Amino acid sequence: MNKTALITGASGGIGKSISETLAARGYNLLLHYNTNQNAAAELAEKLSQMFGVNAEILQADLSAQDGADKLTSSIVQPIDAIVLNSGRSHFGLITDVDNATVQEMVQLHVASPYMLTRNLLPGMIRNKSGAIVAVSSIWGETGASCEVLYSMAKGAQHSFVKGLAKELAPSGIRVNAVAPGAVDTNMMNQFTPAEKEEIADEIPIGRLARPQEIADATAFLLSEKASYITGQILSVNGGWHC
């Protein structure tokens, strides 16, 4: 029987790659999106046709207080894996960030993943199995000037992962995170081509990460090959700030 995975932010660059990778491994998929319905629907249709899996799309704004409850209320089937991938960066001085932006970023990266996971855990605990992976960021480990809000949110994700892993280990559920460095997705569009080159030059491997490389790390942590790994932050950053 195929396992079922929920992937938040499935229509974005990393989310799409994770979805494709898990579909290739036989997972049925619940693909969450916020605004990009067309991209999510096209992805679901493509994966169903290519891999013969069930792929359903679900809409929710996880930056809203009721977003997580709205999303999980529409899920009726047992969940075997959760990929907490929704997120967005924010660039700017701390003194220029208003309260509404702070609340939205904390809701999106911290509160909604907490609530979503809490709502789905009873079934996983009954089954005494499951795996959860949060897609966080290198800045959750090191922090970044002019991305203090984003760094704070991602650091909170890491604490969530470590605490939850200890709480759920007796129930046979593993919890980990993948912490990417600079990844070649639309999130990097805030930088000019020249700035992207400068960032790549700082990375020992000499280039930005590909979304597929983040997807492969995520799939590994969900797999039985990682059966004794929990509470860990797997840095996928090409040696940048390691």
From Swiss-Prot:
Binding site for NADP(+): T8, G9, A10, S11, G12, G13, I14, G15
A single MF term (Gene Ontology): oxidoreductase activity, acting on the CH-OH group of donors, NAD or NADP as acceptor
Pfam families: adh_short_C2 (PF13561)
Record key words, sorted: Oxidoreductase
Keyword Metal-binding attributed: no
SUPFAM superfamilies attached to this UniProt entry: NAD(P)-binding Rossmann-fold domains
Binding site for substrate: S137
Active site: Y150 (proton acceptor)
NCBIfam families recorded: EF_P_mod_YmfI
Family: Belongs to the short-chain dehydrogenases/reductases (SDR) family.
Protein name per Swiss-Prot or TrEMBL: Uncharacterized oxidoreductase YmfI
Naturally occurring in which organism (per UniProt): Bacillus subtilis (strain 168)
